[in-house]
Design a protein with these regions (language model features):
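A ligand-binding cleft/hinge motif common to bilobed small-molecule-binding domains
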Residues: 82-85, 216, 222-239
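Mature extracytoplasmic/periplasmic domains
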Residues: 250, 254, 259-317
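Extracytoplasmic ligand-binding site segments that recognize negatively charged/polar headgroups
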Residues: 36, 72, 77-219
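Periplasmic-binding protein-like
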Residues: 188-197, 236-260, 305-307
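Bacterial N-terminal signal peptides
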Residues: 7-16
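Ligand-binding "clamshell"
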Residues: 87-94, 116-120, 232-244, 306-308
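Sec/Tat signal peptide C-region and signal peptidase I cleavage site
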Residues: 18-22
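Early extracytoplasmic/lumenal segment of secretory-pathway proteins
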Residues: 23-85
Length: 318
């Protein structure tokens, strides 16, 4: 009987101890193809924290998931306008910068951006532009204007984004409006232009991540694309070129945030700070080709041609 009691007590004690022995983790919700896989491995090896990595394809998909239950995620990667919305809905935790020493490398102009004026809720991850990636062998002349995406000579030859913000923004810019306008007449006019484009059969497909591979394969004359994906595609196909049209475009920023009530807040801070290390930020830049907001990483780039590439590092004029 004593032996049975001892076994029972031992089992009970082990059961009580199991939660404390459980492996630490961090739940990350990021875009498709938006991190160097080796970076995750390095973080896990250094910290012993397991990264549960989940992916989304649009800001809107991510927003719905976070609104439904923010506690499911510890680190998310929303774009600027979604960060602003998440702040307004009280769905983000304030960041403890005492645990983010590598945030010091953030470029000055991104430390207190309009969408997060005090920089309390987000650390920039990547930034870039929206433009047109086109195949020089499949267009009649170099592309300079957004109107090219409505040109009927390119029927069934244009990829548009499956992104309300960017697709509507392009139509607004083509019509001479701000991408951020809230004027309903302007928004309805832009909506009508997009309907007109679709009815004319110009759009081959509405998609996001697939466009870069299909442009590499020469499957369309042009596609609406973010600058990083364009740079990646051009590295595989010399016939491709990227342009920010003369009417102007959107400079966007994707940030790293911690949702309200995150279960692993401390681990989330460790993950964000790890990504802000200059050498780690450089690894991500080299892998995904988006513009890094990390001054330390930029200093590590020793190729002047890379620094001069306006697809990778847009100038003030762009």
């Amino acid at each position: 009987m004593k032996k049975l009691l001892a076994v029972f007590l031992t089992a009970s004690l082990l059961a009580c101890a199991l939660p404390a022995l459980a492996a630490e983790e961090v739940n990350v919700f990021n875009w498709e193809d938006y991190i160097c896989d080796e970076v995750i491995d390095l973080f896990e090896e250094e910290t012993g924290i397991k990264v549960n990595y989940m992916r989304f394809t649009t800001n809107e998909d991510m927003l719905v998931q976070v609104q439904a239950d923010p506690k499911n995620y510890d680190v998310i990667f929303p774009s600027d306008y979604i960060i602003e919305r998440l702040i307004s809905e009280d769905l983000l935790e304030e960041l403890d910068y005492s645990q983010l020493p590598n945030a010091q490398y953030t470029l000055d102009w991104l430390k207190t951006p309009d969408y997060d004026p005090e920089g309390k809720y987000s650390v920039p991850y990547m930034w870039g532009t929206v433009g047109i990636l086109y195949n020089k062998t499949l267009v009649s002349a170099p592309i300079t204007s957004w109107t090219a995406m409505w040109d009927e000579q390119y029927v069934d030859n244009v990829f548009m984004m499956d992104s309300i913000r960017d697709t509507l923004g392009v139509a607004l810019k083509m019509l001479g409006y701000s991408m951020n306008t809230r004027d309903m007449d302007a928004l309805n006019e832009a909506k009508d232009k997009l309907i007109e484009q679709k009815k004319a059969g110009i759009v081959k497909a509405y998609q996001v991540d697939e466009t870069k591979d299909k442009m590499i394969a020469g499957e369309a004359a042009m596609g609406l694309m973010w600058s990083g994906d364009a740079a990646y595609a051009m590295s595989f196909n010399d016939d491709l070129a990227y342009v920010v049209p003369e009417e102007g475009s959107n400079v966007w920023v994707d940030g790293m945030c911690i949702p309200k009530g995150a279960k692993n807040y401390e681990n989330a801070l460790k993950f964000i700070d790890f990504l802000c290390r200059p050498e780690i930020a450089l690894m991500n830049f080299e892998e995904i080709c988006y513009c890094t907001p990390n001054s330390g990483a930029i200093e590590l780039i020793d190729d002047p041609e890379v620094l001069a590439d306006e697809t990778l590092f847009p100038s003030d004029e762009t």
